[in-house]
Amino acid sequence: VAAETGHVACHDAGAIEFGGHKVLTIPGYEGKMHAEDLENYIQVFYENESYEHTVFPGAVYVSLSTEYGTLYSKAELAAIHAVCQKRQIPLFVDGARLAYALAADECDITLPELAQLCDVFYIGGTKCGALCGEAVVFCGMHAPAHPIPRIKQHGALLAKGRLTDVQFEALF
């Protein structure tokens, strides 16, 4: 589930669908969703008598910061995370622009706090000066079992990955 103005719904060239999934959209406001809209969407989904025959909302997607340059506040992210926890749906934070979000004067979230406000996020490297790489962070007990074979099967496991690691140590 993503905001209709969110990156994954508009600017990912169908990457989610290419992998066999579907992006379900709710109203978006400059790239952001509101917790109330998310709760209403999920409530309506379960009230539908034939919900078992429709696409199940399997994750919630937000960007920090959005392509519009907007930021989620700690309170907004906490409210969305609360809906996700209540409904047992993981919250994924797209952190392609996370370095810029965390550096913004308006941002009231720290990196450790972000880890408490979602289930998985990633830290984009290339948009903040790295030559390549993104770091996926699984929070709490949400890490998948045996991730390396899955990464390798998708052609995303870099040889000499230590070179990528060094950049993240320097940047974050």
Report the location of each language-model feature.
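Active-site C-terminal subdomain of aminotransferase-like
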Residues: 56-58, 63, 71, 110-172
